[in-house]
Amino acid sequence: FGIQLYYYLFVYGRIPKYKDTRRPEILSETPPVSVVIPLFSEDYAFVEEILPLIVAQEYPDFEVVIVYVGRDTDFYDDLVRIKQSFPQITATKIELNPRFPISPKMALNVGIKSAHYEHLLFTTPDVYPSSDRWLSLMANGFRRGEIVLGYCGMERGKGFASYLIRTWRMMHSVDWISSAVCGRPYRGMRQNYGFTKRLYFGANGFSHLNMNIGEDDLFMSRIIAPGNVSVVLSPRATLREKSWGGLRWWIGTQRFFGGAIPFYPLWVKNFIQWELGSRILFWLAAIVALAVMPWEFKIAAGVLLLARFAIVLVEARRISRRLGEEKICGRYFLYDLLSPFFALLLGLLLLRKDERVWR
């Protein structure tokens, strides 16, 4: 119970009241920014629906660098033609060769080298901004750090599965957001983060090149430090990721990107696991007390259960408002009960090597 209170009141509880403006400025004004987007398919939905939202951002000086990996000449020509209407778009093509697969890190590396500006933001083609202020808020973060971390939630859909996916995304993002807010950053989010070219080339580019993942966590852990990180938390700076399936798709996605977790520093793994472990032990102790202990212990267990849930619900509501999430708290009790089982399932799946992770 004490560990749970510590996490929700003193760690997660710092997110709603966090103010990046308390950090000293390293730039006197917001810099020009390059937004780098790797594109691994002929995604016309991105071109027609999402790209217009990005180029329409309220920011005076930016470019969008699209790195297309493929062999469709017509699609690439369409990207080039779009530049006539939107001059801030830069399209780069990497010819797809099945004998030499292109990883996301390779595509991002080409995008970084093609970018004209020092300050870089990264996102993916399946996410869209919640407002026309996303870019300006993220770029403003560079005034106080060479690394900018933002949040990306899941698109709201119908059904309980969509609710679980959205809440899982929010609460698991809370781990790295709260750690960054508390002065111990260790990763970003591949849909919404940025850094400078100086940091990238100073680290000799991406690490773990034998993996198809890790650009937002394993590499970031090399360049990240408490003094160079700016965390941008605002509903207007939140991105939304499209959902491509139900729980089976989501668990498969978590298994894929979870392949980087074994390479995290020990303190990060302990930080993540202590909350989950203490929650499981608390539930088990409460169930045992309610089932077999004398009535005095049953009353005490019931009071502690209600007190914990009230605290968790209040903090979850405050966090969801800060991150721009809606309709989270009404069914949070069910997520609180079910998420340990999903975490256990994911842990078992991670014991088996995922061939998609490795090159």
Residue spans for each PLM region:
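Long helical/loop segments within the catalytic core of UDP-sugar-dependent glycosyltransferases
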Residues: 86, 91, 96-103, 107, ...
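N-terminal membrane-anchoring/stem segments of glycan-assembly enzymes
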Residues: 1-26, 316-319
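Acidic donor-binding/catalytic loop of UDP-sugar-dependent glycosyltransferases
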Residues: 124-140
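Membrane-embedded multi-pass helical conduit in multi-pass membrane proteins
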Residues: 279-354
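Catalytic donor/gating beta->alpha subdomain of glycosyltransferases that bind UDP-sugars
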Residues: 147-172, 201, 206-269
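Short aromatic/hydrophobic "clamp" motif used to bind/position activated sugar donors
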Residues: 120
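Cell-envelope/extracellular polymer assembly enzymes that use nucleotide-activated donors
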Residues: 31-34, 63
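Acidic donor-binding segment of Leloir-type glycosyltransferases
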Residues: 51-98
